[in-house]
Amino acid sequence: MNRDTICVQGGYTPGNGEPRQIPIIQSTTFKYATSEDMGKLFDLEADGYFYSRLQNPTCDLVAKKICELEGGTAAMLTSSGQAANFFALFNLCEAGDHIVASSTIYGGTFNLISVTMKKMGITATFVDPLCSEEELDAAFQPNTKVVFGETIANPALTVLDIEKFAKAAHAHGVPLIVDNTFPTPVNCRPFEWGADIVTHSTTKYMDGHGAVLGGAIVDGGKFDWMAHADKFPGLCTPDESYHGITYAERFGKEGAFITKATAQLMRDFGSMQSPMNAYMLNLGLESL
């Protein structure tokens, strides 16, 4: 499907006699016949829903549409764009790690990285997005885990050279996260230029009506986590809170990142978008 069609039809294909618009599943919990069925969900052995703090069918339909628009392999919604950026970064970083980021990013995200995440033991080096390749390379440290930038900076409007930043990130064995809020995938798809993870504040142009807060994270499904297992223990070593599963082994390049962000971060922080907000976001996407 072309992008115009995805805006309207993506993420949801109603069957005969089913609603034309995506249904609003305004429910906190979901019923299962046996405790064994529920147990498989808790152990990540089966797909499904049990608590809307982690996942909700309405939200997943809209996330799937955004995933299709970006050309990714997996996606999730969050309660805001700030939550999306925090989840994307914290899904890879822990105390003692380092981030390389564009210096012209949105002020809220700049403070998230430079102030709040610093309190969590995560440091950062900010670089001019127009810097030379040599200057960019010099910003990396042995403990660098991710590179972050915005396709078009908010509000500076500086355009990120995604290919340059992706090349540098990959040379150091780390992924590039690009906040694609301003262009949206209608005007730019960062995965086509080398980005590995894309985030959005859907509050802006995706909603398009100033009606609902929201965020999204999309995985391009190409970064090989296991090839850099020493850098990403959260993805490549057993998770004791889920009976020792290893996300990169169980879900592969295509699904490990979003599964971990959902199973760990959404479980613990609960920054889930509401079904009603997701429904209204979908209306905005239809006219994107």
Predicted features by range, described:
Residues 1, 56, 60, 190, ...:
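N-terminal start-of-domain structural block
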Residues 1-56, 64:
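N-terminal "arm"/small-domain region of PLP-dependent enzymes with the aminotransferase-like
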Residues 7-13, 75-288:
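Conserved PLP-enzyme active-site core in the AAT-like
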Residues 16, 50-53, 65-68, 129, ...:
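N-terminal targeting leaders only when they are immediately followed by extended low-complexity/repeat-rich tracts
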Residues 19-20, 71, 120:
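Short, basic and Ser/Thr-rich N-terminal targeting/leader segments
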Residues 34-86, 108-116:
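Conserved N-terminal alpha-helix of the aminotransferase class I/II PLP-enzyme fold
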